[in-house]
Amino acid sequence: MRSRLLLPVPHLPTIREMSEELSHGAAGQEPPASPSLDDYVRCICQLAQPTSVLDKVTAQSRPNRPSRPAWTREKRRQAESPGDSSLCVSSLQPTLPSPGTDNPLDWLFGKSQGEQADGRGRPNRTGSSDPWDVPRQMGKDTGRLCEARVPEHSLGRKPGPRHQTSDLKSWTSRKSCRALASVSSSRPSSILGTLYLHLPVIHEL
């Protein structure tokens, strides 16, 4: 079944058949000549030619703009003062080391260290005069925030199980801190007694 379907399909011509048809089929017409070596080299030279050369050729073919008269250029140069140009040149040129210095690296590092020292010596007067005012103010603000926090059970609400566990953890941490402070201040003989007194009591559920 499959072979019967493929039989009426015309096959594509091969390369040999195409060349034979071109050579023998066209009567009285010569086949096109193959490109010679000179044509090949000429095409390569055209492809390898840079675009800048083409741009120059197109620019030369365009009509040139009318040039400004020389007296306008002279007026413009006279308008610019020589002092301004000297200032611009002096600002652009960096300061060179003195001829007495042996190593230019020593001069360069000495200059950078001097600039850093000048920057440190100048106080930052944009804010307050005391640099410790900002941390103190932040500490006061955090203290106020801590004082503003009120436990929920003091407002008449029943503490939930999560709040109870958090309160228990905070209470144990406070007790341990107090115990450590008392241990550091007490005598070695009373260390065990203070530890037993301040240890938290765990109730069985």
Curated annotation (Swiss-Prot):
Keywords: Autophagy, Cytoplasm, Mitochondrion, Peroxisome. GO terms for cellular component: mitochondrion; peroxisome. InterPro entries: DEPP. Induction: Up-regulated by hypoxia. Its main location: cytoplasm. Residues 55-171 are annotated as: Disordered. It comes from the Eukaryota. Residues 138-155 have a biased composition (Basic and acidic residues). Residues 55-64, 83-101 have a biased composition (Polar residues). The keyword Mitochondrion applies. GO terms for biological process: autophagy; regulation of autophagy. It is found in: Cytoplasm; Peroxisome; Mitochondrion. Acts as a critical modulator of FOXO3-induced autophagy via increased cellular ROS. This is Protein DEPP1. It comes from Mus musculus. The lineage of its organism: Eukaryota, Metazoa, Chordata, Craniata, Vertebrata.
